[in-house]
């Protein structure tokens, strides 16, 4: 079963959208294997978003991500990366379809509520940045037989 990393960013936490995000994840048949709310340290944020280090928006991105609590999750399920990115919607909320998290709640591209890994490699890297293996649970949903026949 594929795993991905998901973060409800500080704007999503501050706007009370954590429960909404979790509900949408679980309603799509995905399961949450790990969850933590914390203020991400600057060094961790820089490691997570390192591929953007040369971009002009990098300093403001790091400032935003470390500005308040966020919720980090390990989410698993069949095609979890693809499904989670579909749930999130396009990065720019102008392009995000209604019914997606960003289409329904994001205010602008810099305050777009949620992050999810975009590839298996990114998922493995991001999960390792935010969680130890011992913090990731293992369980079966009672509906997995129906979901993954």
UniProtKB/Swiss-Prot annotation:
A GO term for molecular function: nucleoside diphosphate kinase activity
EC numbers for this chain: 2.7.4.6
Highest taxon in the source lineage: Archaea
GO cellular component, one term: cytoplasm
CDD domains: NDPk_I (cd04413)
InterPro entries per the UniProt record, alphabetical: NDK-like_dom (IPR034907), NDK-like_dom_sf (IPR036850), Nucleoside_diP_kinase (IPR001564), Nucleoside_diP_kinase_AS (IPR023005)
Protein name stated in the entry: Nucleoside diphosphate kinase
């Amino acid at each position: 079963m594929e795993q991905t990393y998901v973060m409800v960013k500080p704007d999503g936490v501050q706007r009370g959208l954590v429960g909404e995000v979790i509900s949408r994840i679980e309603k799509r048949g995905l399961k949450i294997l790990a969850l933590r709310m914390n203020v991400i340290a600057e060094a961790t944020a820089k490691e997570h978003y390192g591929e953007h280090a040369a971009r002009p928006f990098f300093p403001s991105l790091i400032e935003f991500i470390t500005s308040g609590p966020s919720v980090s999750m390990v989410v698993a399920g069949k095609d979890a990366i693809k499904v989670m990115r579909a749930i999130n919607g396009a990065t720019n909320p102008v392009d995000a379809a209604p019914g997606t998290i960003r289409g329904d709640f994001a205010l602008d591209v810099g305050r777009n509520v949620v992050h999810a890994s975009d590839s298996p490699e990114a998922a493995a890297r991001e999960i390792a940045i935010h969680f130890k293996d011992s913090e990731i649970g293992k369980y079966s949903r009672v509906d997995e037989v129906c979901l993954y026949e």
